[in-house]
Regions:
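Conserved tyrosine-mediated DNA breakage-rejoining catalytic core shared by Y-recombinases
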Residues: 6, 10-50
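Acidic, low-complexity interaction regions
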Residues: 68-71, 79, 84, 156-162
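Catalytic cores of nucleotide-enabled group-transfer and carboxylate-activating enzymes in metabolic
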Residues: 21-24, 72, 102-103, 113, ...
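Short basic/aromatic active-site micro-motif
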Residues: 67-71, 87-107
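C-terminal catalytic core of tyrosine-transesterase DNA break-rejoin enzymes
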Residues: 3-7, 79, 96-121, 128
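C-terminal secondary-structure termini that scaffold catalytic or DNA-interacting sites
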Residues: 56-59, 144-162
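C-terminal catalytic core of Y-nucleophile DNA break-rejoin enzymes
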Residues: 31-50, 59-79
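Catalytic-site neighborhood detector that most strongly recognizes the C-terminal catalytic loop/helix
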Residues: 30, 34, 70, 118-143
Length: 162
């Protein structure tokens, strides 16, 4: 979802609402900046939330998820990384960064949308936070090359017909 640890910890059942598209969205206010964060709920996070509906810490409260301390969450992420052979120090904040770069920007989500989902006050923050990956630049340039090649082909075909 790209939410910071504290924002996930504070999520309540009331933060899941129908968006203008009729789909479920997380609509909450960021603890750090007090700005709105509006995030369409993708299938995997939706399944995770559904999986905890009957958890004792969730059933009798307004909380959406049973959240441990940030330190404990990071410890679990480290264990998961080790078990998966990932040689990176996974942290909750790194997950937020990965959402911003790899999940959204690399897949063509405009930076303005990413900024809105992350709840940044300024686009400048998102530009600094979610630096464009070399893969994204390469992908964008490949798409541009393809367009230019098609235009060049059309131009050659037009000249042949004259």
């Amino acid at each position: 979802t790209g939410l910071a640890y504290i924002d996930v910890k504070q999520l309540s059942k009331n933060d899941i609402v129908k968006g203008i598209d009729g789909e479920n969205w997380i609509k909450t206010k960021r603890a750090k900046t007090h700005t709105r964060s509006n995030i369409p709920l993708l299938p995997i996070p939706a399944d995770i939330i559904k999986g905890y509906e009957d958890h004792p810490q969730v059933v009798n409260s307004d909380k959406l998820l049973p959240i441990l301390s940030n330190q404990k969450m990071n410890s679990y992420l480290k264990t998961i990384a080790d078990n998966c052979g990932i040689n990176k120090n996974l942290t909750y904040h790194l997950a937020r960064h990965t959402f911003a770069t790899t999940v959204t920007l690399t897949n063509g989500v405009p930076i303005e949308s990413v900024s809105k989902m992350l709840g940044h006050k300024s686009l400048k923050t998102t530009q600094h936070y979610a630096k464009i990956l070399d893969r994204k630049v390469s992908s964008d340039m490949s798409a541009l090359k393809s367009i230019l090649n098609k235009e060049e082909e059309k131009s050659r075909e037009s000249k042949k017909q004259l």
